[in-house]
Amino acid sequence: MSENRPEPVAAETSAATTARHSQADAGAHDAVRRGRHELPADHPRSKVGPLRRTRLTEILRGGRSRLVFGTLAILLCLVLGVAIVTQVRQTDSGDSLETARPADLLVLLDSLRQREATLNAEVIDLQNTLNALQASGNTDQAALESAQARLAALSILVGAVGATGPGVMITIDDPGPGVAPEVMIDVINELRAAGAEAIQINDAHRSVRVGVDTWVVGVPGSLTVDTKVLSPPYSILAIGDPPTLAAAMNIPGGAQDGVKRVGGRMVVQQADRVDVTALRQPKQHQYAQPVK
């Protein structure tokens, strides 16, 4: 007789299945207990394909590009700002006397007075030397001429004698009035820098010879130059190379522009002959003595 075996196989299969489920549950329980989450061993795993460029990636890349261009723009603005500040500082360098402290101005004035004292002492020394040469009957004509030329040059420089020669005649009208002391100082300094050898400032009634220690104070419409009060219009005579002196007045941002900025008007005329007749009186010096 044959026996029917399917029932035990089914039982065995059911038992195996039950065992596998028990192991899986135990493994999952153990994974949860250990803090790991894993798929069952018989669970199919999905394949990870290549990453695609998303809209977020494009936005991030666009943001980086904008950041680079923004940084370059900021750097360009900084460079332009530095250049502008440098230019402004160079343009305003002529106005340093306006912002100088009174103590600094006193030191500057004292140094100019010492310079004038030295020049006056040298003039006196040369005059004494010339007198000694003439008194001794020295026939060295070259030495006499050299001493006389040096004495004449220094005498003109300190304003002890008059002078004549080519130069410029400057007229400053100030209807405002607006020409302040620093504007007049700028005109004097520009002429000196251009090689003016003798300068004289006039108004309708007074004349002042500009020296190495000349100072200007006051208010627009009433300028005090070396203790003399002058009123507009002002006339300035300067001896030197006429084209050079005229060009110095017309430098952009220079003396003529400074007069225009405050409402004044400057006219510069070149001349073959300019006569500077005002003199400066030598000052008695208490401390400075000529060096032998």
UniProtKB/Swiss-Prot annotation:
<keyword id="KW-0472">Membrane</keyword>
<dbReference type="InterPro" id="IPR010273">
    <property type="entry name" value="DUF881"/>
</dbReference>
<protein>
    <recommendedName>
        <fullName>UPF0749 protein Rv1825</fullName>
    </recommendedName>
</protein>
<feature type="transmembrane region" description="Helical">
    <location>
        <begin position="229"/>
        <end position="249"/>
    </location>
</feature>
<feature type="transmembrane region" description="Helical">
    <location>
        <begin position="152"/>
        <end position="172"/>
    </location>
</feature>
<comment type="similarity">
    <text>Belongs to the UPF0749 family.</text>
</comment>
<feature type="signal peptide">
    <location>
        <begin position="1"/>
        <end position="28"/>
    </location>
</feature>
<keyword id="KW-0732">Signal</keyword>
<dbReference type="GO" id="GO:0005886">
    <property type="term" value="C:plasma membrane"/>
</dbReference>
<keyword id="KW-0812">Transmembrane</keyword>
<feature type="region of interest" description="Disordered">
    <location>
        <begin position="1"/>
        <end position="30"/>
    </location>
</feature>
<keyword id="KW-1003">Cell membrane</keyword>
<feature type="transmembrane region" description="Helical">
    <location>
        <begin position="68"/>
        <end position="88"/>
    </location>
</feature>
<keyword id="KW-1133">Transmembrane helix</keyword>
<dbReference type="Pfam" id="PF05949">
    <property type="entry name" value="DUF881"/>
</dbReference>
